[in-house]
Amino acid sequence: MQYQKVLQMLNCIPYLSVGLDVGADFTWMSIMLPNGTLTGKPFKIIHSDPQSRELAVTKIKEAQEMYSLKSRCFLESTGIYHIPLLCFLHDKGFDCSVINPIITKNSTN
C-alpha cells in the first residue's frame, strides 16, 4: 500500500515537460510549464553539432533553475533517429521517456 501512495504522490509533483520532435538531421525542442505555457520559443537542435546539443542542455537547466522545477524529457520514437539524443540527455542526468507517436495519436481519437 505504501508503494502505491508514493507513486500517486510522484504523479502529483509538477515538472517541466521537455518535448523533443526528432527528425533525421535535427530535433525541435520546446519546454513547457505544468500549466501548459511554453517557457520560450522552440529550439532547433542540430544532431551533428555538439555545441547545439550542449546549448539544449543549458536551456533545460536554465529553465529548471528559473522555475525551481525538475524536468522530464519526452522524445518521439523515430526508428533509430532518437537514440543518440536519448543517450546524450540520459548521460547528462535527465529523466527521459520515448513516446510512440502512433499510440499517442490513437489515444486522442
Regions found by a protein language model. Name each.
Residues 1-109:
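Phosphate- and other anionic-substrate recognition elements at nucleic-acid/protein interfaces
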